[in-house]
UniProtKB/Swiss-Prot annotation:
Skewed-composition ranges (Acidic residues): 1024-1039
Topological category with respect to the lipid bilayer: Multi-pass membrane protein
Protein name: Tiny macrocysts protein B
SMART domains linked to this entry: HAT
Keyword field contains Transmembrane helix: yes
Gene Ontology biological process terms in this record: cAMP-mediated signaling; regulation of gene expression; RNA processing
GO CC annotations on file: membrane
Biased composition (Low complexity): 1048-1062, 1083-1094
Organism ancestry: Eukaryota, Amoebozoa, Evosea, Eumycetozoa, Dictyostelia
Biased composition (Basic and acidic residues): 356-372, 1123-1144
Function: Regulator of the cAMP signaling pathway specific to sexual development. Controls the levels of external cAMP by regulating the expression of phosphodiesterase pdsA and its inhibitor pdiA.
Gene source species: Dictyostelium discoideum (Social amoeba)
Bilayer-crossing regions: 47-67, 93-113, 140-160, 185-205, 231-251, 253-273, 285-305, 315-335, 706-726, 953-973, 1179-1199, 1325-1345, 1358-1378
Length: 1416
């Protein structure tokens, strides 16, 4: 019982171990597949190797200048800023930036790992992954390991860099944000970081150990004998990143670690000499010596620990210039010393023809002589061709203890390098010396897998001895080598497998498939070509099988013919690409030859390819190795001009495009016509080509296709133009908003100037009266005078900007709006300091071109009041004079300039008789606002008119484009579609006329490939991108039902007989008299069904046979074929000599319902319905095109039109602000003792204020200001009302209540007695709050302005999105509808031509009447 348990436990343990070992082998196989796909022929080019070395130098140097080291002085500060600006890029952005960067890196790494897993899985299954996936994998591993290893590891370590605190364990990098280390949001980051560090490190170390070029013959890349030193460098990088990320708070530990590892790397780079290129080794050693110097000075800096002294910095910088040459020359001297050890090695001068025994004897004598000499270091014994298993060469240097096995490879490298430098007189002698050195080294280091790997590499790449190389490889395999050596063996095995497939690749070093990925792509392409080839033959067989039915479905025939043409085209393209990659592949040449013969019917080109394949095969069979000379192949049959041309240009065998130009095909075929044809036949052939050209629609389809491309491009360009126009309107609309505010502010300044002049007069009148001192009045007058002068400049600039058409009047506003815009981020300049000249305006606005604006600025339409004060008279009167808007504004500004300069005495005594002063004060409250209100209205109307005109132009243009589209459909599409459809039916009807024996023979022909691949099942191992796989089941009923023999066994037997009777096709068709004996149909002039005629009559053939096969050589004479057929009929041997399959099919006529003589039923309805859908296709596509564009334009029209009305709303808000100033003007007049006070004008201004205020929309953006939640709206917050103010509650209730109070109090003041006016609380309310109200109303206006600008930007975004989507939709409509439609037309035409290639000559020249086509 116990023994049973023990046995079972042993069995379980053994099975577990075997499972583990099997899994490890599977894992190794997958990883080796990934590495091989990634590495083969695609290691770093020279320039990338140099760049990666420079990046590595910078990364390693930066570890000496981290933040924890006390580099002193400004020099130390800048060194740390330059060499190590940040610990990691994520530190710059905080924890949020680190998180974003972390997940981006994680996503890219996961994609890379998935890529690795996919490639490994495919290789494990024996497949090859997609080519682009392999290329992506190469760049991912190369870039992430060689360049980004330190940044990625450092980034992953940031989430693990924790420290303890009172709040728990937090991330040390972001201690100010208090991020918990293994809790909350950082927990998944920490877990994923640990996993990715392990996985990424495995990937990095594995690729570093294997990702290198070992072939010294490759000149485009730097080769290496091994990559173990690179693994050491990568480990040092990992340690540096780990220590500087997690323990950087212990600078002594990081600095010592830095120094120790740099000592190892520096001496390692000198001793190991990792690259075969010695100059690169020297440069690398120089870089490592520089970093070693930096690490040493880092220790010195830590010891001094003085952050004020820059001495160590300067010493470090100076020492760099000495450290590099020290490392450089140390490497060079070491290599020379090691090379000098082999300088005395001598080899026997053996001629190539020398007998091996004689050479051994001579070698023995020389070795004895050399051993007797005092300078001899090497003893040569007898040296047969072996692997060094016996100690026959004595080299005392290898007995020394410090000598390591890799010294042998370095010394052999020096021997070969000396040969390259011209030291050795013979290349073969150097190779033999190196070989002997390797064998000597293997005797002293027999267990060194590294040395055996170097020796195998030498045999394969340098000595070119594959036999001994593979023997050495097997020896190495039995040694249980390390991982990198096992991968080297795997590489050589794969290369051997690739070489063994020579019948597919052809001779080595020819073609373009030396790269592994290119080779696998070549194989994948080859199996795809075979698949298409076989499918094409199957479809041809199905096509003829369907014709055995009594009722022939033309739709099924059309479908099969389409598949024949499609697979033929794919196979042809695949074969041409294969020959372009490798023109000497025997298997491809044979398969392509068969394809040209059986499908394309191009026998001459097929013969050329077959002959070339036989010649190459003969050379390859005679050769004992895989080394070929391409000149041997190119010399095949060089005496024949046509074959020579074929061999020199393998891709010159071009199939004629099935839709090629008929004129070119006709000219080529005409030159190859047989001389036996009569002149009448030649002229008849030209006539047939001319008639065929009438229905040949290739050129028409191409032109129509380009026309549709042009039409779609025009529509897209139209939408782009519309978008540009609408964006231009948006800019114009935005500038118009600016202009509306500017116009109102111009009127505001005019009203304010009038009020200030009245105030100046009032202060002059009350000077010295009561508490009003003269000094105080003068100060107030001076302040008001400065405001008037500034207002004049502002008004002048705005007035000129509007008239001259300033394109961007954003700065042309009053002081309140200017501050509001500046606070909101607008670029504002001061317009109140200097008057701008004409040249300083950009004058790009076109709104002034409106008729209404032109009339307003050029026609007298404004009545201005002018004061009449005759000299010497105390009476004054007012006179009305008509101005235009431009002259009125200029007159007002000029008068204000003069009025602002009046003296104190003039203000006090004689200003009422000053016409300039009174011109301003009288016209300011009514006339000037009225002028600018008209200008504003005309300005807005001009904008709306411009928008409406643009929309109308776009609409009319689109209607014209749609009309053109409709004409294209009616005039071009319909005739071409109808013509192609009818010719399709006409061609299919012809096949129903084929003799039955021909149909039976072609439907039972056995499909057999010439080139049989022993690994034919391997094509199932390759992924396919074919989209015709789903069509393989189409017509399976044809194979089952339409087979003329009852069972498949009979089929196969009969097919064998058919191969011997390819030329015997029974036919009763007689071209001379137009009879078809087997079908019982005789052509006659009165027949409406079928008409045949002689070549001398005007018949309408579907295609000239020589036109279809334009690339073929001279065809057999048609008269000879007809004569042969007549002889067969005459001798009566057609049926007797027919195949068994033909006799069997004829005996089973009843099974198919057609006896071969009676007329068959043709089902044309389904095909006609399908072809009829073509008309609906282009109609639907056209209306979709029209619909999408119309919908996009309609939406954009709606958005633009709605926004165009927003100018009126903004104008009302501006008018409300203007009316408040007019009201304030009249209130000021009430206490300035003015004799021109008009109560009615004041009431009108109040009414307009209320009207504007009540009609403005209640926007969400304005609601806080109106309801009081906005707070203090003063521009200067120091002027806000304190809570202790008696007006605080009223103002705090919102601008809506304040405006209402303004209107009510202004009405009260208008009807208050003059004597009680000064004591009125309403007047005190005005004096306290009016400036505050102005700012509030201006803020409301700016809010409306900003709202409409945002709405305009949103509309612009919507317009851009809609029109962009419309452009994409148009492109999609073209790609999804128009392009497939044109391709469908072209395919229908191509299929028609492909059908003609299948048509026997017996029916090809027949004419089918229109009645047969039209009948159902």
């Amino acid at each position: 019982m116990s023994s049973t348990k023990s046995g079972s436990s042993k069995y379980s343990s053994g099975s577990s171990i075997s499972l583990i070992m099997g899994f490890s082998r599977s894992l190794e196989k997958g990883s080796f597949g990934v590495l091989y796909a990634m590495i083969k022929g695609n290691t770093f080019p020279r320039i990338l190797t140099i760049l990666s070395m420079l990046i590595e130098f910078c990364q390693l140097s930066s570890f000496g200048f981290k933040h924890q080291y006390p580099w002193g002085g400004d020099a130390g500060y800048y060194l740390k800023r330059i060499m190590s600006p940040v610990s990691h890029p994520s530190d710059v952005f905080g924890y949020l930036g680190f998180t974003i960067l972390f997940w981006i890196a994680v996503g890219l790494l996961i994609l890379g790992f998935l890529n690795i897993w996919y490639v490994a899985y495919q290789f494990y299954r024996g497949k090859i992954a997609n080519i682009w996936i392999i290329r992506t994998l190469r760049w991912f591993v190369s870039f992430s390991v060689a360049v980004l290893f330190i940044p990625i590891i450092s980034l992953l370590l940031i989430g693990l860099d924790c420290e303890g605190s009172s709040e728990g364990t937090i991330l040390r990098k972001f201690d100010n944000e208090t991020i918990q280390c293994f809790r909350g949001a950082n927990l998944p980051i920490a877990v994923i970081s640990i996993i990715l560090i392990v996985v990424f490190s495995i990937v990095a170390f594995t690729s570093s150990a294997t990702y290198y070029e070992y072939d010294t013959n490759v000149k485009s890349r730097f080769s290496k004998p091994h990559a173990r030193f690179d693994v050491t460098v990568l480990f040092a990088k990992f340690v540096f990143a780990f220590f500087n990320s997690l323990v950087d708070f212990v600078p002594w530990l990081t600095s010592i670690t830095f120094f120790v590892f740099m000592v190892i790397l520096t001496f390692g780079s000198i001793i190991v000499l990792p690259y075969n290129n010695q100059r690169l080794n020297q440069v690398r050693s120089g870089f490592y010596t520089v970093v070693l110097w930096v690490s040493f000075m880092t220790l010195v800096t830590m010891g001094i620990n003085d952050e004020t002294s820059p001495a160590t910095c300067y010493i470090t910088i100076v020492g760099v210039f000495f450290a590099f040459p020290i490392g450089f020359f140390s490497n060079m001297f070491y290599f020379k010393w090691l090379s000098s050890k082999v300088s005395d090695i001598q080899i026997l001068n053996q001629s190539p023809s020398m007998d091996l025994k004689d050479a051994n004897k001579k070698g023995k004598r020389n070795s004895v002589e050399k051993e007797s000499s005092p300078t001899s270091k090497v003893t040569w014994g007898k040296q047969p061709i072996t692997l060094g298993s016996k100690r026959q060469i004595i080299f005392p240097f290898f007995k020394k203890k410090f000598v390591m096995s890799f010294f042998v490879e370095i010394m052999a490298r020096s021997i070969l390098n000396n040969n390259n430098e011209g030291v050795s007189s013979s290349s073969n002698e150097s190779i033999e010396r190196a070989n002997n050195l390797y064998q000597c080294g293997l005797q002293y280091f027999p267990n060194s897998d590294l040395l055996w790997m170097a020796y195998c590499n030498f045999l394969f790449t340098v000595r070119k001895d594959r036999h001994i190389g593979y023997a050495a490889l097997e020896k190495l395999r039995r040694m249980k080598p390390s991982f990198d050596v096992r991968f080297f063996i795997y590489q050589r095995d794969k290369e051997r497998e690739q070489i063994m497939d020579s019948d597919l690749r052809g001779p080595e070093h020819t073609g373009k498939i030396q790269d592994f990925v290119s080779y696998m792509e070549f194989k994948k392409l080859y199996y795809g070509a075979k698949r298409h080839h076989v499918k094409c033959l199957n479809y041809i067989k199905r096509f003829w099988g369907h014709l055995l039915h009594e009722t022939v479905d033309l739709h099924r025939l059309s479908d099969l013919s389409g598949r024949i043409a499609t697979t033929e085209n794919k196979a042809n393209e695949s074969y041409e690409r294969l020959l372009a990659l490798n023109p000497n592949s025997v298997r491809v040449l044979r398969d392509y030859s068969q394809f040209l013969e059986e499908v394309v019917k191009d026998k001459e080109s097929s013969y050329k390819l077959q002959k070339k394949a036989e010649a190459i095969e003969d050379i390859m069979s005679k050769s004992q190795t895989t080394d070929f000379k391409i000149s041997d192949i190119k010399a095949i049959d060089s005496d024949e001009d046509d074959i020579e041309k074929t061999l020199q240009e393998p891709t010159a065998i071009q199939l004629a495009k099935i839709d090629a130009d008929i004129e070119k095909s006709g000219s080529k075929s005409g030159s190859s016509k047989s001389k036996d044809d009569s002149s009448e036949s030649s002229s008849s052939s030209k006539g047939r080509r001319g008639k065929y050209k009438e229905f040949q629609q290739s050129n028409a389809i191409n032109k129509l296709s380009w026309l549709m491309i042009g039409t779609t491009c025009c529509c897209i360009i139209f939408l782009i133009v519309v978008l540009v126009v609408f964006r231009g309107l948006e800019v114009k609309h935005t500038n118009a908003y600016q202009g509306i505010i500017s116009i109102t502010d111009c009127a505001n300044e005019a009203v304010q100037m009038g009020m200030h002049l009245n105030a100046m007069q009032a202060y002059a009148l009350v000077a010295g009266v009561g508490n009003n001192t003269v000094e105080a009045s003068l100060i107030e007058i001076a302040r008001r005078r400065a405001l008037v002068k500034r207002g004049i400049i502002i008004m002048k600039n705005i007035h000129d900007a509007i008239y001259w058409g300033e394109g961007n009047p954003v700065s042309y506003v009053g002081d309140n709006l200017s501050q509001l815009k500046a606070r909101d981020g607008y670029d504002i300049f001061d317009i109140g300091s200097v008057i701008f000249t004409f040249d300083q305006f950009n004058r790009s606005s076109t709104l002034l071109d409106n008729k209404q604006m032109i009339e307003l600025y050029s026609q007298p339409s404004v009545n201005m009041s002018v004061l009449v004060a005759p000299p010497g008279s105390n009476t004054t009167s007012l006179y009305t004079q008509t101005y235009n808007a431009w002259k009125a504004g200029n007159a007002f500004i000029e008068s204000a300039m003069l009025a602002s300069d009046v003296t104190f005495d003039e203000l006090r005594y004689s200003v009422n008789q000053n016409p300039n002063f009174k011109f301003v004060t009288i016209n300011a409250p009514v006339i000037m606002p009225d002028i600018y209100n008209k200008v504003q209205t005309a300005y807005i109307d001009s904008l709306v008119s411009d928008i409406t005109g643009t929309l109308d132009a776009i609409l009319y243009t689109w209607c014209g484009i749609f009309a053109v589209l409709f004409l294209i459909c009616a005039v071009l599409f319909r005739p071409i579609v109808r013509k192609i459809s009818r010719e399709k039916i006409r061609t299919l009807v012809l096949f129903s006329l084929a003799p039955k024996d021909v149909v039976v023979k072609l439907s039972t022909k056995k499909i057999k490939m010439v080139s049989l691949d022993s690994g034919s099942e391997r094509d199932n191992l390759f992924d396919t991108t074919d989209d015709d796989g789903r069509d393989d089941h189409l017509g399976e009923d044809d194979n089952n039902i339409q087979t003329p023999v009852g069972d498949n066994n009979n089929n196969n037997n009969n097919n064998n007989n058919n191969n011997n009777n390819n030329g015997s096709i029974s036919s009763n068709v007689t071209k001379s008299d137009g009879e078809i004996g087997s079908d019982g149909v005789r052509s006659s002039s009165g027949s409406n069904v079928l008409n045949t005629s002689s070549p001398y009559r005007d018949r309408r053939p579907l295609m000239d046979s020589t036109s279809v096969l334009a690339s073929t050589a001279t065809l057999n004479n048609r008269n000879v074929r007809l004569q042969a057929k007549d002889e067969e009929i005459t001798n009566g041997g057609g049926e007797r000599k027919g195949s068994d399959a033909t006799r069997t099919a004829l005996s089973e006529d009843k099974k198919y319902g057609w006896d071969g003589k009676s007329k068959r039923n043709l089902n044309k309805k389904s095909l006609k319905s399908i072809l009829g859908r073509l008309h609906w296709s282009y109609i639907l596509a056209t209306f979709l095109l029209f619909g999408f564009i119309t919908m996009g334009i309609w939406v954009t029209f709606t958005v633009v039109f709605n926004n165009s009305q927003s100018g009126y709303t903004l104008g009302k808000s501006c008018s409300r602000s203007l009316n408040s100033r007019v009201i304030n003007y009249y209130v000021a007049e009430l206490y300035t003792y003015s004799q021109y006070v008009s109560t009615q004008n004041m009431v009108d201004a109040i009414t307009e204020l209320q009207s504007s205020h009540q009609s403005l929309p209640y926007l969400e953006e304005v609601r806080p200001l109106m309801e009081g939640s906005y707070g203090c709206w003063a521009l200067n917050k120091s002027t806000c009302l304190p809570p202790s103010s008696m007006y605080y509650e009223e103002v705090n209730s919102g601008l809506d209540r304040v405006v209402d109070s303004l209107a009510k109090k202004a009405i009260n003041l208008a009807y208050t007695d003059q004597a009680a006016l000064l004591d009125s609380p309403d007047l005190q309310w005005f004096l306290a709050l009016i400036d505050y109200i102005f700012i509030g109303l201006d803020t409301a206006t700016f809010t409306y302005f900003d709202y409409f600008l945002e709405k305009q930007e949103w509309a612009n975004t919507v317009l851009t999105a809609i029109l962009s989507v419309s452009c994409v939709i148009l492109l999609v409509v073209h790609v999804v509808l128009f392009r497939p439609f044109m391709n469908h037309l072209r395919i229908q035409h191509i299929h028609t031509l492909a059908l003609l290639r299948l048509a026997p000559d017996d029916i090809r020249y027949m004419e089918v009447s229109d009645k047969v086509i039209d009948e159902d």
